[in-house]
Design a protein with these regions (language model features):
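N-terminal "arm"/small-domain region of PLP-dependent enzymes with the aminotransferase-like
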Residues: 1-52, 158
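Short, conserved charged micro-motifs
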Residues: 37, 314-321, 353-356
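Phosphate-binding glycine-rich loop
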Residues: 60-99, 116
Length: 368
């Protein structure tokens, strides 16, 4: 069965006829710089704690996050990755008349909403407004916009689920774009899983607004930026009453001891954060330029650590060839109905790895 998410190395290895370790994975949008040394040190230091249950309130991690975001502890809830917290956001959205979802959307949003029988209304991005004149030398800007479909019920009876930066396009919306919806909707859930990739002077987080708007929920992931997908840790920021309701219904000890220790360390790792912010823009730009020069490929500009690419060649076929001939895995977009088989997504990796991808794509597109 084809994977729904990126990072399925077992499937990729079976397709390529090699071991999972031989796969160069561009399908999962994980930073190649991590995990930080601080995470490894924290895990080693807490191995002796495996004999005890975790602190159910995760006070050490929560207190550190409070310092980072200038909030009191009751406004923050650590979770088993942002996916677990998305489930509870889906539970709240399903209580409303409708849940408006900006599409194309991460497949897990549908899971979380359908789990509680939410009525989903899609609001598609206008991807066709992009400048496609690559041949004229005009840079293709990511100016994609969205116009919300009018709900069948009033806005005050409906909820909105959006991510910023947007996955899979990489579009970053200014906070002023989203703020008006906080006055209109009963609930606004903003997934900021990729916001950490932007330095403080560029990020557009709505966390500073959460105390003003009790209908605002922010989801944050520590998976992508800190390269910790195997540990499963993230957190939600929302009104204490809402988070307390979630806590009463979730499983106990959702975050294991080692994940909590690593998370506590990395959010204080200023050196890793700074090096990541310095690394990403030039490396992403080099990959963007390389993709732009390959016939039949049209990348979108991105504020995140990945690039969405439109392809003249069916991407399912391209993915198979990359695996079988080069042991490289890209993320097809078949799980995004609005995109289908003419788009793929690639993570930004090291310059050497990016060059390997570009050479393989050039070979496959020019020889086909």
């Amino acid at each position: 069965m084809r994977p729904v998410h990126g990072g399925n190395l077992a499937w990729a290895a079976a397709t390529a006829g090699c071991s999972p370790d031989a796969i160069l994975d561009f399908s999962a949008s994980i930073s190649p710089l991590g995990p930080p040394k601080s995470a490894i040190a924290a895990i080693s230091a807490h191995l002796g704690s495996l004999r005890a249950y975790p602190d159910p309130d995760y006070r050490e991690l929560t207190n550190v996050l409070c310092q980072v975001h200038q909030l009191s502890p009751e406004w923050i809830l650590p979770g088993n990755g942002s996916a677990e917290l998305l489930t509870w956001a889906g539970w709240d959205l399903a209580k409303l008349a409708e849940a408006i979802l900006v599409t194309p959307a991460f497949g897990d949003y549908y899971r979380a909403l359908k789990a509680f029988d939410a009525k989903i209304i899609k609001s598609p991005l206008d991807l066709e407004s992009e400048d496609r004149s690559q041949e004229t030398g005009v840079r293709r800007e990511n100016n994609s916009s969205f116009i919300l479909q009018p709900p069948s019920f009033s806005f005050f009876e409906s909820g909105l689920l959006i991510n910023n930066p947007h996955n899979p396009t990489g579009k970053l919306w200014q906070r002023e774009t989203i703020l008006p919806y906080l006055e209109q909707f009963a609930l606004v859930v903003v997934d900021e899983a990729f916001m950490d990739f932007l330095p403080p002077e560029r990020e557009q987080s709505l966390i500073p607004m959460v105390q003003k708007y009790p209908n605002l929920v922010i989801l944050r992931s520590l998976t992508k930026f800190y390269s910790l997908p195997g540990l499963r840790v993230g957190y939600a920021i929302a009104h204490p009453d809402r988070l307390q309701r979630w806590k009463q219904r979730r499983d106990p000890w959702c975050v294991n001891t080692l994940a909590a220790a690593a998370a506590t360390a990395v959010v204080q790792d200023l050196e890793f954060q700074k090096s990541s912010w310095e690394w990403l823009p030039p490396t992403r730009e080099q990959l963007f330029q390389g993709l732009s020069q390959i016939p039949g490929l049209h990348p979108f500009e991105s504020a995140a650590n990945f690039l969405l690419v439109e392809s003249a060649q069916p991407t399912q076929e391209l993915q198979q060839k990359l695996l079988q001939q080069h042991q490289i895995l890209i993320r097809d977009c078949l799980s995004f109905p609005e995109l289908g088989d003419r788009y793929f997504r690639v993570a930004v990796r090291s310059n050497t790895e990016n060059e390997r991808l570009l050479k393989a794509l050039w070979q496959l597109t020019t020889m086909s």
